[in-house]
């Protein structure tokens, strides 16, 4: 169960505004109006978030740059889960227009391209709006108003977003209602509006005098338009262009005003000068300019306090033994169900011996980068080992998976070609297509890649139909599809055959981060490529669609496969597996490789021997897979719900809780019983979608798994 919270703030005025030419008009506020809109916002939250959300919305109302309100009204209404419609966010792009005239020309061109014959009329109507709280509905073909033609317009209500573009990045991308991130709110509203089939397009200008970026949206597409109005102008409004019968338009209005919608896949706002209110706290709990301390320590203390007040501060637990099933956490003996040491190789005697020998032979550190004095024999031999293990010609070692993803993505965005002259105006030279639940390291790498002539389009999670449409519409000469192999929160697997088929059809490169698949997927633990290769050889045990045509093994290989040593291999570091020319390109151009000290020989040697151990002891992989399937089956048998869509083949098992307070309570209850299972809640996952994230290891016994199920049955009231 969730609750819809709405805030409206207004100031009383003695007379109404008029149109810019001084005359009263059909598109302006009536002279009978007795108040001026200051601010409005809404959220859909779980019960545990109501009080904090109300406080944030009230703060926003009283600190808005539109002025001091006389009246602030906050309402709370219950919304049943089955009443909520879940939809994906529109695909996004930005037009860097430099003048108001340029912005208006761009809007007109976009509308004409979308088949809107009344583009100029719609834009003129938009620029004449003053004080209308809702949106004006205009017929896309005739320009006539299709709503009730009053001063209120159509109010789009009952909406929110989950603000999740990747599981581990969600916290970084979160923002309270008080911050009013215009881009995220606008994209949420536009996505809801465009979801109704009667809506052809939407135009929007914010009424905030300090915010000059507006947008136009058409069929599945959201385009930010910079400098849509002069700085300081109070002009603002919305126009929806619609087609349909009177009954269809009435249904559209009812949907816009009454249907509860949560939009998924809203990304982090673009980093420009117009993405946030001035003097308001940002997503990290920043302090208004008037309160910022002059010294760093005080600034940090204030920011931490703001972060803690939102319930977002974290404190790392101290582990004092190896990450084995039975370990010591914060001084207590604990049964560990949260480690990525999936195969138990971090404590394998052969792996430890290899690290020890390398430490003695090479020393503790390398003293240089790979291109200076840090390229040891163990580095090159381990790269060959990883390349052979994954079936590639070459591999390039990096210090961490985060570094590997960031360096690879930023490097692929060099020497970007210009779009052909036949492409639409402002087409970027490179477009990156990113799954909405990708890991933070991919998201940050894409941010670095899109600082130049590159853009990103975020597609709904594993939605290959949406991806295909986006690729078909893309005129960029360079395309790149980026996805996790195994998604770190839900434990589901990327549809690699479909991704590769689309990439070949549309001339796109592919990068897959197989951090959680390396050592865990496939009959010998070689990862996602082997997993899907196995799927064509046997019908059982693979998450493939019935009848899906699987290509041969070589066609399953992405251009770049990122593998990490810090999870199933029990060591640290990562590698980008690829062709030899691509590897040499990375060694010469990837800044994370060129300017970083090479990995410690002990870790690299441990990685090499871990791979050999997997090949020598394949039963470890099989035992991990058996444990994962057994625990999933036991949880389901006892009525403990798993997150929809999670795979049976990965060691990541997300247990659905929903309410954030329940997740904290159950996680603490497990801790009291000697288990370590973290509760994952907002902002790492969407509000009201809290989970317990369980991971299995090959070294867990069946008794370990059964004890966890018993504890969960005691703590979860609806389990059997």
Swiss-Prot record:
The keyword tRNA-binding does not apply. Pyridoxal 5'-phosphate binds at residues 401-402, 488, 513-516, 564-567. Substrate binds at residues 314, 439, 684. Keywords: ATP-binding, Biotin biosynthesis, Ligase, Magnesium, Multifunctional enzyme, Nucleotide-binding, Pyridoxal phosphate, Transferase. Pathway: Metabolic intermediate metabolism; pimeloyl-CoA biosynthesis; pimeloyl-CoA from pimelate: step 1/1; Cofactor biosynthesis; biotin biosynthesis. Its cofactor is Mg(2+); pyridoxal 5'-phosphate. Pfam families: Aminotran_1_2, BioW. GO terms for biological process: biotin biosynthetic process. This is Biotin biosynthesis bifunctional protein BioWF. It comes from Corynebacterium kroppenstedtii (strain DSM 44385 / JCM 11950 / CIP 105744 / CCUG 35717). The lineage of its organism: Bacteria, Bacillati, Actinomycetota, Actinomycetes, Mycobacteriales.
């Amino acid at each position: 169960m969730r609750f819809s919270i709405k805030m409206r703030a207004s100031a009383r005025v003695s007379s109404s505004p008029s149109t810019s030419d001084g005359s009263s008009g059909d598109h302006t506020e009536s002279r009978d109006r007795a108040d001026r809109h200051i601010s409005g916002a809404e959220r859909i939250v779980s019960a545990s978030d109501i009080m904090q959300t109300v406080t944030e919305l009230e703060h926003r109302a009283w600190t808005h740059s539109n002025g001091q309100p006389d009246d602030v009204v906050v309402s709370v209404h219950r919304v049943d889960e089955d009443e909520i419609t879940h939809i994906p966010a529109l695909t996004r792009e930005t037009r860097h227009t430099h003048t108001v005239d340029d912005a208006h020309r761009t809007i007109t061109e976009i509308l004409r391209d979308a088949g809107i014959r009344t583009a100029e009329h719609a834009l003129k109507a938009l620029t004449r709006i003053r004080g209308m709280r809702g949106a004006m509905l205009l017929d896309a073909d005739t320009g006539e108003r299709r709503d009730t033609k009053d001063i209120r317009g159509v109010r789009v209500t009952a909406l929110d977003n989950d603000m999740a573009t990747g599981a581990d990045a969600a916290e970084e991308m979160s923002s309270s209602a008080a911050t009013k991130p215009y881009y995220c709110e606008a994209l949420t509203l536009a996505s809801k509006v465009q979801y109704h089939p009667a809506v052809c397009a939407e135009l929007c200008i914010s009424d905030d005098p300090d915010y000059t970026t507006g947008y136009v949206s058409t069929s599945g597409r959201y385009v930010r338009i910079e400098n849509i109005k002069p700085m300081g102008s109070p002009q603002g409004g919305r126009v929806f262009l619609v087609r349909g019968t009177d009954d269809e338009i009435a249904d559209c209005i009812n949907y816009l005003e009454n249907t509860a919608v949560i939009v998924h896949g809203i990304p982090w706002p673009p980093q420009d000068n117009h993405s946030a209110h001035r003097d308001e706290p940002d997503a990290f709990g920043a302090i208004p300019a008037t309160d910022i301390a002059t010294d760093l320590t005080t600034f940090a203390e204030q920011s931490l306090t703001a972060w803690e007040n939102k319930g977002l501060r974290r404190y790392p637990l101290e582990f004092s033994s190896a990450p084995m099933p039975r370990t010591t956490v914060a001084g207590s003996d604990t049964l560990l169900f949260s480690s990525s040491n999936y195969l138990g190789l971090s404590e394998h005697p052969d792996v430890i011996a290899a690290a020890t020998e390398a430490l003695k032979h090479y020393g503790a550190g390398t003293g240089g980068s790979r291109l200076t004095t840090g390229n040891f024999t163990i580095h090159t031999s381990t790269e060959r080992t990883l390349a052979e293990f994954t079936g590639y010609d070459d591999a390039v070692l990096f210090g961490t998976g985060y570094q590997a993803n960031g360096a690879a993505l930023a490097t692929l965005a060099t020497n970007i070609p210009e779009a052909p002259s036949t492409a639409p105006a402002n087409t970027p030279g490179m477009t990156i297509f990113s799954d909405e639940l990708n890991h933070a390291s991919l998201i940050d790498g894409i941010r670095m890649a899109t600082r130049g002539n590159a853009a990103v389009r975020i597609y709904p999670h594993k939605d290959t139909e949406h991806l295909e449409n986006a690729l078909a519409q893309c005129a960029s000469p360079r395309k790149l599809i980026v996805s996790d192999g195994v998604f770190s929160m839900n434990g589901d697997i990327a549809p690699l055959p479909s991704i590769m088929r689309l990439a070949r059809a549309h001339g796109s490169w592919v990068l897959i981060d197989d951090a959680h698949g390396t050592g865990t997927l496939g009959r010998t633990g070689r990862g996602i490529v082997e997993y899907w290769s196995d799927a064509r050889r046997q019908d059982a045990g693979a998450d493939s669609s019935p009848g899906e045509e699987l290509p041969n093994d070589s066609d399953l290989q992405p251009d770049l496969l990122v593998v990490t040593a810090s999870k199933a291999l029990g060591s640290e570091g990562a590698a980008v597996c690829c062709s030899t020319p691509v590897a040499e390109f990375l060694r010469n151009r990837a800044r994370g490789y060129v300017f970083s000290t090479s990995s410690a020989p002990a870790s690299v040697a441990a990685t090499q021997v871990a791979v050999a151990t997997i090949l020598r002891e394949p039963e470890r992989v099989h035992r991990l897979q058996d444990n994962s399937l057994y625990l999933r089956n036991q949880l389901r048998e006892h009525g403990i719900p798993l997150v929809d869509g999670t795979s049976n083949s990965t060691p990541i098992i997300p247990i659905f809780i929903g309410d954030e307070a329940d997740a904290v309570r159950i996680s603490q209850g497990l801790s009291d019983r000697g288990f370590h299972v973290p509760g994952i809640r907002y902002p790492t996952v969407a509000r009201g979608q809290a989970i317990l994230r369980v991971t299995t290891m090959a070294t867990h016994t069946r008794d370990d798994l059964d004890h966890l199920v018993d504890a969960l049955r005691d703590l979860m009231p609806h389990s059997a």
